[in-house]
A protein has these predicted regions:
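Nucleotide 5′-phosphate-binding alpha/beta core
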Residues: 1-110, 116-130, 137-141, 156, ...
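Active-site phosphate/ATP/adenylate-binding loop shared across adenylate-forming ligases
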Residues: 1-15, 71-218, 223-235, 259, ...
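AMP-binding/adenylate-forming catalytic core of the ANL superfamily
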Residues: 195, 292, 298-398
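A generic "binding-loop/recognition-motif" signal
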Residues: 201, 246-247, 327
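Conserved AMP-binding/adenylate-forming
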Residues: 230-311
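Short acidic, glycine/serine/threonine-rich loops at helix termini
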Residues: 162-165, 253-256, 417
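Short, well-ordered coil loops that connect the C-terminus of an alpha-helix to the N-terminus
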Residues: 117, 237-238, 246, 359, ...
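General small-molecule cofactor/ligand-binding pocket signal
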Residues: 172-175, 241-243, 270, 402-407
Length: 429
């Protein structure tokens, strides 16, 4: 089957909605066990990792994380691949911005490394075509049989978009290494029907009065902060949709109401609870569409928050109210009555920052040390600042007060991801 036919087949096969959890479980069960049989027979690492555990008991498989995967990548893959050659090609592509070289039918790319170490993703033409069909089903503003011009603002181009493009669907790549004012002129000339970009790019286009009228806007590759979502939505007069993707897979996408739902038609997402009462968890991903680089019982460091109640769109796929960030984004402040540290999740920091002044347009918050938090604000001359949000937070969490250092916030969209809240200080050192 050609790439384009496979993309169309996957588009048509992707359920628009699931009516019940029972339907989702039936859909997943057969596909997961079939996939695990394939992986066990073709991956030396997983065959050893699962030794003594039956395929049907896959929920008992030991977890995998990025470190374990990267340390065992050659034996984890289900295809023979010269990793040194693959890495050379991927590194060269990032420098030359020519992403066409591959190893056979395999494309190789690096993650952005926001978690501290860079991962690698390896996909075949078949997987890429399947992925494209799935994402078109979840993201197009209309039918695949209509005319579309999809603009993609990416840190690295993909070999696959050109292959699945057609007379009806055109893909345009906008390289984030270029200056943003140049990219804005280019996208205005293109005037795409669908715009997929990091929220920092969407925010830049909104702030600079970009003259385009897309039917659908999709935020991807960065956490969409409420302050950015509001401004982007108001400027373009529409719901800001989201693709929540990572090196480990396409984890969630929004429904027509703009609510994130886990992509449970292509993966099972288990939960390692951080705070079950409030719905915070680390996702444990079993992707039954990834064959070359299998992702099975893979624990992510991201923090997701379950949406309370059932989404009004009627889709039974698990709804997510927020992608809160990574474990690296959790602040740790010393308790008043001991030498132990209290974790403070990003949402609490965000709320305290937003109470500083109602005129805040953009911000960042970085924990620099055990006792210091840097807060960047835009505009930079806001006055007065109300610190009561932080004072209440320190009191409620029973932690020692941290020094709040106010600086100017400045971020120009580029290949570096925007992270509004994160921790530079290692509380374990």
């Amino acid at each position: 089957m050609s790439n384009k036919l496979l993309t169309l087949w996957r588009y048509l096969r992707t359920p628009k909605k699931f009516k019940s959890r029972a339907h989702i479980e039936r859909w997943q069960k057969r596909r997961i066990v079939k996939h695990i049989k394939f992986v066990r027979n073709n991956s030396v690492f997983y065959a050893n990792h699962w030794h003594g555990i039956a395929d049907d008991d896959w929920r008992k498989f030991p977890l995998v994380n990025k470190t374990l995967m990267m340390d065992n990548l050659e034996n984890l893959l289900t295809r023979d691949l010269d990793l040194k050659k693959a890495y050379r090609i991927a590194k060269s592509a990032e420098i030359t911005r020519d992403f066409s070289p591959r190893v056979g039918d395999l494309s190789i790319g690096f993650s952005s490394g926001t978690s501290g170490s860079r991962g690698v993703h390896i996909v075949s033409d078949k997987e890429a075509s399947n992925w494209a069909g799935f994402m078109l089903a979840r993201g197009l503003g209309g039918s695949i049989f209509g005319k579309h011009h999809v603009a993609l603002f990416l840190r690295a181009n993909s070999n696959n978009y050109g292959k699945i493009g057609s007379k009806r669907i055109k893909f345009s790549f906008f390289d984030l290494l270029k200056p943003m004012d140049q990219l804005q002129k280019e996208v205005e000339l293109a005037n795409p029907s669908e715009l997929i970009a990091p929220p920092s790019v969407l925010r830049y286009l909104a702030d600079n009065n970009c003259k385009i009228n897309p039917k659908r806007i999709i935020s991807a590759a960065e956490v969409l902060d409420p302050i950015d979502e509001k401004i982007i939505s108001q400027y373009f007069s529409q719901v800001v949709h989201q693709f929540y993707t990572s090196t480990e897979g396409e984890i969630a996408a929004t429904c027509e109401l703009g609510v994130l739902h886990l992509n449970e038609s292509i993966m099972h997402v288990g939960k390692e609870w951080i705070d079950e009462e409030n719905g915070l968890f680390h996702p444990i991903i079993t992707d039954f569409m990834r064959e070359t680089q299998p992702i099975i019982r893979y624990k992510q460091n991201d923090i997701l928050v379950l949406k309370k109640g059932i989404c009004e769109c009627g889709d039974a796929r698990t709804a997510i109210s927020e992608v809160m960030g990574r474990s690296d984004d959790v602040f740790y402040l010393q308790k008043k009555d001991s030498d132990e540290f209290e974790p403070i999740v990003p949402d609490f920091i965000r709320r305290a920052v937003m109470r500083l002044n109602p005129q805040i347009e953009a911000y960042h918050a970085i924990q620099k040390s055990m006792t210091k938090i840097e807060i960047g604000l835009q505009p930079s001359n806001l006055s007065p600042l109300d610190y009561s949000g932080f004072e209440e937070l320190f009191k409620q969490k029973n932690v020692k007060k941290a020094e709040l250092v106010i600086v100017e916030h400045a971020h120009i969209p580029s290949t570096n991801k925007l992270r509004r809240i994160y921790r530079e200080w290692d509380h374990n050192s």
